[in-house]
């Protein structure tokens, strides 16, 4: 790839910032625009010296190659200006689809577990061979002359159909975007279409009934804990230090593996990584070494200690993700009370999953909900957080300006979950806890 100047419209988006970092590492000039409000991704961009500008059509210059975030429509002033200047314009997924062509590429798709699995795979392969990667938590690394390129493949609006990877891990299929997909059949159709673009093999979770139906031109290997899975985890042991298991491929032992991660899903994610490494004939002992020193990805069970409290920040916003996060908290802290603070994400999703939210949030020892986080597409709805708390014993709605109800808990774990701006609630709690 010859050196170029890439201009990102929406550079602070999690995928966009990761891609900007990859191109910067590969020796290109990179800059971009976004809102001025602080976003967690800009820390990495600033550290790399990548210029972030406020939106302004005057930013665009002749010779730039433009990469536009998928949330910006063609009538955005900067996109219009880029067209006037005759600049080459790519959408994020289109550009990524081109970029991965020069590598042994491994995508990770699925409604849940994408970022955690991509992060684990990127970390593990990086310790064994030259690996470039793009993770949905805003982390990206471009290594010149890489063998592997690991990337997160998002099914939203069928964007992942821009990718033709060598391998694809599919963690699960779920009806997670009711604003775009019409139902499970529609989501399955997208995954099957993508499966038929994979060049070497698919690694799919064996307990997902939809993934079990996959028909593809390449082999589909299933991973899980049952005897019918191709890659099987046996002798699983989960304790307060992490999770360990023996990995088998068709009854042949690959090796023993440990990850310092928590929750049932962590074993599955690690097994998927082992499966890809096994197909690429990588040394199982080296893979075990790298899995054992993984430290996690941003906003996935990110922990801190303050006073006598453990505070966890997690991106979980779908019922299955909340269940997995609370399960992880119970595994790591079996003797502490688990307090859930959840910010529902969008009215349509909250309404679609109301009974499931009630069920999974009831697993916590105490539950608080913030008001619903609305998206740019959807400002109001027919449901309120109070509709959910009313169905959970002892649950209540909590507001950023009054986090005092959390001060009654001591020597406990508070798990903040959400995909919106839940961090501002966490920050407000930390402020009053520190002052107490």
Curated annotation (Swiss-Prot):
Record EC number: 6.3.2.8
GO aspect biological process, one term: cell division
Molecular-function annotations in GO: ATP binding; UDP-N-acetylmuramate-L-alanine ligase activity
Entry-linked SUPFAM superfamilies: MurCD N-terminal domain, MurD-like peptide ligases, catalytic domain, MurD-like peptide ligases, peptide-binding domain
Intracellular or extracellular location(s): Cytoplasm
Enzyme class, broadest EC rank: ligase
GO cellular component: cytoplasm
Gene3D superfamilies: Mur ligase, C-terminal domain, Mur-like, catalytic domain, NAD(P)-binding Rossmann-like Domain
The protein's annotated pathway: Cell wall biogenesis; peptidoglycan biosynthesis
Family affiliation: Belongs to the MurCDEF family.
NCBIfam families: murC
Role noted for this protein: Cell wall formation.
Annotated HAMAP family: MurC (MF_00046)
Name of the featured protein: UDP-N-acetylmuramate--L-alanine ligase
Record gene name: murC
